[in-house]
Amino acid sequence: MIDEALFDAEEKMEKAVSVAREDMATIRTGRANPGMFSRIVIDYYGTHTPITQLASINVPEARMVVIKPYEANQLHAIETAIRNSDLGVNPTNDGTIIRVAVPQLTEERRRDLVKQAKHKGEEARVSVRNIRRKAMEELHRIRKDGEAGEDEVARAEKDLDKSTHQYVAQIDELVKHKEGELLEV
């Protein structure tokens, strides 16, 4: 029962770190990156579908992204979705592909993006701590119901704390890395 609670908590913490990693990938750094388009969706025959599933996305140069839709009739919809996104880029459509020039970030925009990265990191840390809290409640319930002894639960609590610190450190490292990318000129 204890192992089950710890395994469940660790699985959820891993998912929280994974979500944080995806969130960090969507923050534009001034360099072209296919991941910056992963959250943009378009209406594809009645279904909201990410652009990454409807087109190949290549980075031929440091500040240029080329998007080639698998179906030519989706070209305009993809272009419109990119233009309406919060990326701050202006796509150009040449009839077969979409080119997206990634502009240099201003100092003010860099600082805003660093704040955004720190905010997303804090959300992930809170998520990990909430998972820890729920797992601790489960461990206390196990102890109270007599399903496990004091020593076993105490050992499990130490393991849970160790895992929590490990995952929070991973999130901190993600934020630090993204901050370094953003402030690099």
UniProtKB/Swiss-Prot annotation:
Keyword Transit peptide: no
GO CC term (a single one): cytoplasm
A molecular function GO annotation: ribosomal large subunit binding
Keywords from the UniProt entry: Cytoplasm, Protein biosynthesis
InterPro entries on file: Ribosome_recyc_fac, Ribosome_recyc_fac_dom, RRF_sf
Span list, region Disordered: 143-163
Top-level lineage group: Bacteria
Subcellular location: Cytoplasm
Swiss-Prot/TrEMBL GO biological process terms: translational termination
Keyword Transferase: no
Its job: Responsible for the release of ribosomes from messenger RNA at the termination of protein biosynthesis. May increase the efficiency of translation by recycling ribosomes from one round of translation to another.
Family as reported in the entry's similarity comment: Belongs to the RRF family.
Protein's name according to its UniProt entry: Ribosome-recycling factor
Origin species: Mycobacterium marinum (strain ATCC BAA-535 / M)
Gene: frr
